Amino acid sequence: MKKSCALVLSFCLLLGAASVPAFAWGAATHAYIAGKLGKIWPLMNANERYGIMAADLFNYDFQYYFNSTVKLYTHGGPGAEGFMGVWANARWWGYQKSLAFGFVAHNEVWGCDYTAHVRGLTYGQGVGYVVAKATELMPDLAALLGSHGFSLDDPVLLEVCHNLVEAAGDILILRADPTIGEKIISACLLRSNDFPGLLASAMGPAWKDAVIAAEKEFRRTMILYGAALTQGQEPAVKAFAEHLAQLGVELIKFLGGPDIPLDLAKGLAESGIRQALNLCRSDYLPEVNATVSFVKANLAAHGVWY
């Protein structure tokens, strides 16, 4: 118990020392999906896992929050699939295709994030599974905030609930695969050094330094995130709540909301994660598994195979 508490404390302190907020929004879920989609060979699958997580590498620096170029090359949008440049530029030798396979699988046009944020398969049809669950969580979180004299505009409240649902989803993935934390760590440690250059080659020379800096911080954060998951559900919930509170306070201010005290935010975050766990307990894995089949078919249809 003391060992677990010490590791969780270290996780929170190290993340809190980062220059910008950093939190993995559904990284374990993406890593789990990559394990179902990709190759059985360990080094290939480790790079696929890293690639699928790394599409979110810019998410943790608010200066890129509304950046259309970042969205185009990491997640895409209707009729805009800049992320495919990573696949097109990846060489067949080494692990570049493994990285690119995972990276492209993440996209929001026909990849993993489509079912989370656009159109769910088993739940949340028309809005996306995560968006649907976040919307359901909003009244409870609004009531909790209101009991302390705070309120958020609906778009900001939805964004906060979205992050709570994704954190809860990763806890449910941990229940399904107790080794997911180790798999995230190994993906970060074994990832090919080609990744930053591969993404920069798609985004263009002007983005090279930004990609290198963001990827360095992202990789460090993912190692810590995986370490928190290795400690089991309760320590992970507390670690996630600790840092989601830090992220949430800054995100709410960034989006024009009130300055919520950090101590209050910690309690709200933990309560929100636990409520989200109850909302997602029965149908999260069915949606994730349906997403695996959906993405596998779409990868083949778009010529993404190796």
Where are these regions (language model features)?
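N-terminal leader/auxiliary helical segments
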Residues: 12-306
